[in-house]
Amino acid sequence: MLNFFAAAPRGYEYALSLELADLGASEIKESVAGVYFSASLELGYRITLWSRIASRIILVIHKGPCESPEQLYNAAYGIDWQMEFNHRSTFSIDFHGMGGFINNTMFGALKIKDAIVDRFRDDDCPRPDVARVDADFRIDAHYRRGQITIGLNFSGPALHKRGYRSTTGEAPLKENLAANMLVRSGWQKTPVTLMDPFCGSGTILIEAAMIACDMAPGLHRERFGFEHWHRHNDKVWQGLLDEAKARASIGKTRCTTKFYGSDIDSRLVALAKRNAENAGVLDLIEFDVSNALNVKVPGESGYLISNPPYGERLGTVTALLQLYYQLGDKFKAEFGGWNLAILNSDVELLSALKLKADKQMKMNNGALECAFNLYTVHAENTRRVDPSKINRDGDVSDIAVPFANRVKKNFKQLQKWAKKEGVDSYRIYDADLPDYKVAIDKYLDYVVIQEYTAPVDIPESVTKRRLTDVLITLPSAIGIDPENIILKTRERQKGTNQYEKIQANKLELITTEYGAKFKLNLKEYLDTGLFLDHRLTRKLVGQKSKDKDVLNLFAYTGTASVHAALGGAKSVKTVDMSNTYTNWAKENFALNGLNDDKYQFVQANCMQWIKTTHDKFDLIFIDPPTFSNSKRMEDSFDVLRDHVALLSSLIKLLNPGGEIIFSNNKRKFKMEIEALEALNFTVKNIDNQTLPLDFKRNPQIHNTWLLTHAE
């Protein structure tokens, strides 16, 4: 008997051990990412030819303790390598595992290589050559917890490479993953009608058809690792190949199982057909180009096993949630009596199906950990309301009903108001309901959802489910394309969080506000370039700017400066520490045709600039951060602690009768009025003048003050 190790991705061990037992292996022992077993040479060949789940089969030559480089060298040197391969054959070493004295897999591979070369030399035999690519004889070494296992890569190239795949589509499933899905779903025990409405390049269906036809998965492979092994018995191997070919021929003629595959991408369907033809099962599978939501149920019962699309790019998550929700509706309405098995890396997408799983498993798709859920659709289940009908029929989805009703009500009111007001970007919802802690802003034909950090006492699973429900419900509630919804997660403002990049890609739009035009960037940063709650404050700045010298401090993208310029300011100076936002402010001026020299831009630490400038102004607008400890500032800044010092430092910049419009977003901010009055400031709160209708539901979003200094 020979000792083997069947390697497989983590999570496949159980199914692999069952497969090995069915094939006749003995002394089966599950390990991490594989299974040890014993078998005769003939059975080792058979397992290599017939295993659908293993990644590779390793013939174990040595296994023992290893605590030092010397022990590793001695273990490899002690093997009679001339019994394993000829010196004329090239060899390579795949070393796996680290720990202890092994801090680099290359080090382990070199030690074994040195031992092999030295052993050949000491046995008076020419040394074999190392080949990094396509070696004749591949040695596999695995180090774990003080144990070294050295063996021959018996199977050769990865076993999931069956030989029938011509090219791959996007994110193709590996063949052994598809086989594992078929085993764990229960379909393999009783092959019945099988369909995959997201078939891609056809892997699940092809693997299933090969199972139903009793076709060995290795039958189309051209190369195996044992071919250059000295103890290889080609007669036995050829006999197993002949047997497998005969079984496949008989199995195909007896196969009565129906297979149905479809995909919305015609190129992938064409590829799936080519792959199925290469595998010899094309005539068993009915392929079609179709949207999964439109496929017809091919019988009263069967299995639907699939890997629907999933992705993590912002801007696609809402569309995917809509797809999964609609799939759940279709399954419940049309697939009564069917078993479903769905693989996905995003449990929130699976939750959008609104189906209760009979079983939930973990299964790796390459390095990506996925959930593999099994469902039974009972025939008595009834269809729920389709969310796409909310607007058309006046119905409300059974998901997040209070949220849907509130958003619809808000949107109906604000849509008319915004058109009359002359703005096309506004807030629809701002955590109006405690269970749905999000802010929703509409920018022309797009919506940005910002998720606030939930309280620590709310389980993460609850907040995720609520957010999922928001994303499912919103498109139909306000009639927006799911592809035009952008999701962002943010905490309450902390320091410079709002200025950090979150994506490399951009989505730039031009919005209009009281005649002013501003550039928006909806994806690249947490904020979009326009603080919507300051809309009336900017308008006020414009109204007060006629024939005045205006200063905008902590200017961000210079939107208040644009209003000042359009309001007829004599001059406008825009100061911000960020080069990005200073350039953005310049773009906003250019959009409005404001190119005069009287409009100046300064990139500087505002605190330091105030100390050094000698300029004078009639109107200063200042909207400092709530808190900042930027590396480019010498000291931290806290608006509650430091606002008196900040405002007093502006006195020297004011012309006689000059005014300051001071705003901040600190909740529960308390203005030190007495201290400011002692500095000859007249202080007036103007929140009522500067809180737009779309922010009336959240009066603490900001506070705004008008200060006049008396000489």
From Swiss-Prot:
One of its GO terms (cellular component) is cytoplasm. It is found in: Cytoplasm. Pfam families: Methyltrans_SAM, RlmL_1st, THUMP, UPF0020. Gene3D superfamilies: 3.30.2130.30, RNA methyltransferase domain (HRMD) like (3.30.750.80), Vaccinia Virus protein VP39 (3.40.50.150). It catalyses: guanosine(2445) in 23S rRNA + S-adenosyl-L-methionine = N(2)-methylguanosine(2445) in 23S rRNA + S-adenosyl-L-homocysteine + H(+); guanosine(2069) in 23S rRNA + S-adenosyl-L-methionine = N(2)-methylguanosine(2069) in 23S rRNA + S-adenosyl-L-homocysteine + H(+). Residues 43-154 form the THUMP domain. Its EC number is 2.1.1.173, 2.1.1.264. The keyword Lyase does not apply. Keywords: Cytoplasm, Methyltransferase, RNA-binding, rRNA processing, S-adenosyl-L-methionine, Transferase. It is an enzyme of class 2 (transferase). SUPFAM superfamilies: S-adenosyl-L-methionine-dependent methyltransferases. Its main location: cytoplasm. InterPro entries: 23SrRNA_methyltr_KL (IPR017244), DNA_methylase_N6_adenine_CS (IPR002052), RlmKL-like_Mtase (IPR000241), RlmKL-like_Mtase_CS (IPR053943), RlmL_1st (IPR054170), SAM-dep_methyl-trfase (IPR019614), SAM-dependent_MTases_sf (IPR029063), THUMP_dom (IPR004114). Disulfide bonds: none annotated. SMART domains: THUMP (SM00981). One of its GO terms (molecular function) is rRNA (guanine-N7-)-methyltransferase activity. NCBIfam families: PRK11783.1. Belongs to the methyltransferase superfamily. RlmKL family. Specifically methylates the guanine in position 2445 (m2G2445) and the guanine in position 2069 (m7G2069) of 23S rRNA. This is Ribosomal RNA large subunit methyltransferase K/L. It comes from Shewanella sediminis (strain HAW-EB3). The gene is rlmL.
